Amino acid sequence: MASRYEKEDSKRRILSACVQLFLEKGYQKTTTVEILKKADVTPSTFYNIYHTKGSILTELTEFMFGNQFNISGKIVGEETNPVLLYAVETCLQLTLAELNENLREIYVEAYTVPENIELIHKKTTVQLQKIFAPYLPGYSASDFYEMEIGTAAFMRGYMARPCDMYFTLERKLARFLSMSLSVFKVPQEEQEAILSYIENLNIREIANKVMQQLFVTLEMKYEFTLTN
């Protein structure tokens, strides 16, 4: 029993150390040596629980994405048009990546590491089928899975490319939505209404509040305090 509790305690400390380091330094700049030191665990303990940093990223990704959907629902209301909820959630994710470079790196890595992106594909496919099935009658789960692979590539590419004076955040959000909603055969009139709704949101202010709330939630979940 003692060894099981010790393993759980080591896992908790590793997660706490990694999440804090990822947020403060970035995923790529966080070394295994730093994780071991901060978590106060041996290399054998670390590799027995997590084989790579990517394995830790998988747990973090699952938690972060779950929180995003909950927050988006609170912004537009749980009973709203599900397509609008999808638009708000994806636009918030793109905006969060613009507000914080370490978050951008976490998101981009999440869409790159094989086990992570597969988790995203599977979870998002379920959501996409619920949201867009009325527009695509007769489409199966495998059809939505294949479409998710494509729209996830849109998301990764747009998150990885920082905005500038020409490719502004507003243009990025509008282009992403027009591309993804077209994939799911959302009528043009409805697309325009959704784009208008997003344009009238103060998306930067909302995303900043979401980011601060996310940081507080992560601190509570993984028991650490950010230093910056």
What are these regions (language model features)?
Residues 9-10, 41:
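The short coil/loop that forms the "turn" connecting the two helices of the helix-turn-helix
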Residues 10-18, 35, 60-64, 68:
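Generic hydrophobic, amphipathic alpha-helix propensity
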Residues 21-55, 59:
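Helix-turn-helix
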Residues 59, 70-103, 113, 121-125:
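Hydrophobic alpha-helical connector segments
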Residues 104-109, 189-193:
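Short, hydrophobic secondary-structure boundary micro-motifs
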Residues 111-163, 167, 171-178:
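Amphipathic alpha-helical packing segments from all-alpha helical-bundle domains
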